[in-house]
Amino acid sequence: MLHKKPQRANENGISQRKKPSDQDNSSVKEGDVAGVHQLATLLMLLDPSDDVSRILCTDALYQLDRIEEAHKMLSLALSNSSQRSPILSRLALLQFKKGFIYDGNQLIKKVIQIGDTSCLLPIMDIFKEEDRKLMQNHCHAKALSILQSQQGDSYIKEAIAYLSFAIIASGGHAKDSLLARARCYGQLGQKKTAIFDFNAILKDEPYNAEALSGKGFMHLTLNQQKEAVHDICLAIKADASYAIREIHSLKPEAQLIITEWVYNHCRTLLAELLTANNNFQSDPTFNELEVLAEALIKTDNKAAHFHILYTDILIAKEKYDEAFNYLRKSFNGNAIDETVRARYGVLHVKYRNLLVAAQELCTLAGKQPEEVEILVKFMDKRERQSLFQAAGQEGNSLIQENQHEKALDYYSLAVISSNNNPKYLRQRAMCLTHLRDYSSAIKDIDKAILRHSSHDLKTQAEDYCSKGHILLLSCDEDAATTQYMKAISMEHASAVASINNMPGRVKLAGIFSQVANRYFEQRLFEESWKMSECGLLIDENNQELKRLKARIKREASGCIVH
């Protein structure tokens, strides 16, 4: 009956004034409180040792504004009562109300020493808002005073107790006290408890930058990357200046970790947007990315990759001149590496300077192809086509000048910008073969083979011959002959024409003879027979293969070899 009902609030959280009917009810409520007082007094007469009745009586006296009587009754009960914490808490509130701050603080200190802060919860439903506010303000100020003047875990724990009183007195919505207590828990290593307090703030204010930053840092210390990045990004979007100051307050190692996490998140998000969204310039996420990139630059202006990220976002938003000027302002001299040059390359594509674009992009295509795969997504289909044609032509020119290493980068750019066009895969494979990087050359030929048209048998046969030739150069004769056999069975004339070109029919037939003889010695007659027949399709005049076939017939009598 003594507990107050919550005051109505409008949709903005502002308390509404009482209606006349509410004011009429106040007299009824006062009568109820008087009745409670009389009943509690009667119970005390029946049992003078009943602490619960005495506390109920003092609460009624408080609500009837009979403060001195309530104070006197509580003071008398304190000496021999088992309910020390509830009595001390009520006395403290009354002392604050009377203006005796020192006495009130001493009483609160005793409650803290007892360690029973839960006694405040029922009191908060009885005491008036202005009186609760007095306790809240005092306890918060006292906690801050302790934190500013003292050091050590014991003082932090004492401050937490005062802050807990302030939070309870506020009804659980004291933002400043929740923030301070969360930070205290963080200092004590109680990260999850700190996160609980930050979440309490965010429940009322989802975009509170202080709570988001603090919570993000707790997740950082727990090595929870996804959660930390989520909160820090929200904090930056809510109040970038504050979030940046908070990041700067961290130790250098922690600053590096959190900024790299945010950077990687931005990179991933940018790549996903470029892949999934054809009309990405209008996507609001790009504006958020721009804010995050600007914040990263402000946290560490010397980090080149942050400037590169910001440039990429400008390019994605089709702000080409702004991106060009930003690159020129941010990088000069030795700072211009292949990643910076590649961004100039993308801009030159936009400006239709295709040869210059290829020159700027090709080095990165050779060193970090996965990054160029992202950059070409800034280009439309026509721009990519123009780029891979220019890169392919330049690669061919360099081959003629016997500059295979330079040509390789251009072919790599052509492969990437053409989305693994078999033509450029074959050209790069030839270049790699000349440079004796046989394993990479085979990978390119395999990719070309995977993109075969089922009707183009001539091209398929030529690719299998190319792969066979590379395998020969890498001294894998067994695997090489297998590829040539595939080519001959697929399109004989085209395969023989390729073999004539390299390594030559006579030479290859000799290799087939060696492999077939090895199979024969291992008594693998069927394999030896097939190898001999295929070798004779390459060079029908090879006498060794003819003699081997005759030996197989004799040795394998009774075995089916064809």
Swiss-Prot record:
Chain positions of TPR repeats: 51-84, 175-208, 210-242, 304-337, 388-421, 423-455, 461-494, 509-542
Superkingdom as given in the UniProt entry: Eukaryota
Keywords from the UniProt entry: Repeat, TPR repeat
Basic and acidic residues: bias regions: 19-30
Location of region: Disordered: 1-30
Name of this chain's protein: Tetratricopeptide repeat protein 34
SUPFAM superfamilies in UniProt: TPR-like
PANTHER family membership: TETRATRICOPEPTIDE REPEAT PROTEIN 34 (PTHR44874:SF1)
